[in-house]
Amino acid sequence: MRWIANPLNSPKARVLEGALRDSRLKISASALPVLADLLVGRGIDEPEAAACFLSPGLGDLHDPLRMSGMKAALDRLEAALERKEKVLIYGDYDVDGTTAIVILKTAIELCGGAAEFHVPHRIREGYGMRDEVIERAAADGVRLIISVDTGIRAFAAAETARRTGVDLIVTDHHLPGPTGVPQALVVINPNQDGCDYPCKHLCGAGVAFKLAQGLMQRRLEAKDQSRLLMSFMKVVAIATIADAVPLLGENRVFAKLGLQGLRRPVNVGLKALLEVAKLGDGRALTATEVAFRIAPRLNAAGRMDVARDVVDLFDEKDMERARKIAGRLDQLNAERQEEERRIMDNIERRLEEEPALREAYCVVLDGEGWHRGVIGITASRVVERHGRPTLVISCEGDEAYGSGRSIPAFHLLHAIESCHELLSRYGGHAHAVGFALPSANVEKLRVHLDDYARARLTPADFEPQLEFDRELPLGEVTPELHQALVLLEPFGMENREPVFAARAVRLMAPPQAVKDKHVRLRVAPAVNGAVATAVQDFTPRCHPDAAAIPTHRKERDEWGTRQDGGASSSSSSSSSSSSWRDNVAFKAMGWGLKESCDRLQLLAGDRLDIAYSLGMNDHPEFGGLELTLRDLVRAR
């Protein structure tokens, strides 16, 4: 694996460091140089932008009217409410689509209206807006349809709506096609031509939230707006994290404030969901927990059965009924995991047996009857393991349905657009697509995409690489630094968890294997070109100022960020002496690194170069600062 150091802009970082030193954030002076380097490395080099990034609040949300089409959409929606017209919200079956329905439906109801909703069945209807659904809605008296997280390429659906006398408002975040946007009454999408909205990377629920925000600004008092916006923030945070959009700008406001609100949810369905995910203990949640424990259960409804269960869960007022729905989602998620394992086993065998398939620049895998609900997440797994753009296709008789995921260097939507004549329909983003095609075209698609990728990629694009932010010797790792790094949370797309490099650290004992794949180590810092020989574990009990080190996530939130998103004040003085730092051993966890350690045949006393992230172990008995290893090699 290649280690790549992100470039440092020291002059800008030092200017920002001075501004932060004088700010209201009260960050420890010893942590400021590292924090400033990290912010500038993320493109945040102005004091005002840094303050907003570290301490976002509701005031950092943009005016919804800055989005093209918003005023016209609000005018039409208000007219529907005044005339008590039937309104239908047309969503999608993933987390983003179902939560977008929840947000907009709730906002309409709070503003005195009512709305029905439709979530397509993944297998029977597939992705996108169907003509027959619109025709049926028109026959039932619906006069306004609002799409959420879908519709930006629904040209036929827009024509059907116009023919049946239904006004269609499209709200979406997916990229428009080369021929523009549908001829709907209004199209709201920050990515459409001519839209100057500052945050281009909203998820579908984020766009729906902006419509809901605009509606509440028109129809509710200011005090009610703030309270309800904070309530919606929890739901839009789940969608924003689950849809893996960049956690910058407005998305960061959603995620940061929403995660704080998830500590104490009011919504009965959300409480039941957190319970079944074993997260309902009142502690602060992380983006990782949302991505891997909440989102999969919500996604399981659309993957394995009927996604309207998600909307019903958030609508439910009775706790016992909510627990039953949440339990059903949990069971569906278990079924999804088993189906995913079955398909992955099949795929791994094929990749091992077919070198030409394994060595393709764009891997196209197909199987008869593979469950459509899990092919997307399976494609993600293949990309993670093999580092190549991957499409996974389920063949069902004469028709085939596919989902693709990509690597940073390859724009997958452009790739499938280049062979659109082979496809029945398609859509997506640079690194995630969905599509359908005749089964007879699968082999043609495989050949075309491999040729297309070979013309644009090199073998270096497939080589695993690890980007690290800067070198940070273990002797400079302190509780105050960790406290400052917490301000950068939540981590995700384009705001990944900081990764540091430390050279010539000493391995204090042989690695301990954990569940066959992982390892636990103890490492100590190098000291003045040498390595410490007498060290003590870094735990709260041995720290000279043990009371200052939090050992529970509950405490971490108290000293890290306030409930309103602002930073708490902390002492700018450090009680840790340099001599103490030089004589501390850190516990380190290497997830998936057992094979690397076995290959290196590590022994106590070996010197290593490590790439690591810094975290806090919450265990009440032996918690404290802990390193998460990203990679390790013998010191040069």
Model region roles, listed by residue range:
Residues 5-143, 164-165, 217-444, 454, ...:
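Hydrophobic helix-and-loop "lid/oligomerization" segment in the mid-to-C-terminal part
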Residues 595-611:
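Short nucleic-acid-contacting surface segments enriched for D/E, G, S/T with interspersed K/R
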Residues 244, 264-267, 454-526, 580-599:
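A contiguous loop/helix-start segment that scaffolds small-molecule binding in enzyme catalytic cores
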Residues 620-636:
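OB-fold/S1-family single-stranded nucleic acid-binding modules
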Residues 399-403, 550, 625-629:
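Noncatalytic, beta-rich nucleic-acid-contacting surfaces in large DNA/RNA-processing enzymes
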Residues 137-140, 147-245, 416:
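Conserved phosphate-handling catalytic cores of large alpha/beta enzymes
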Residues 18-29, 526-582:
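Intrinsic disorder/low-complexity segments
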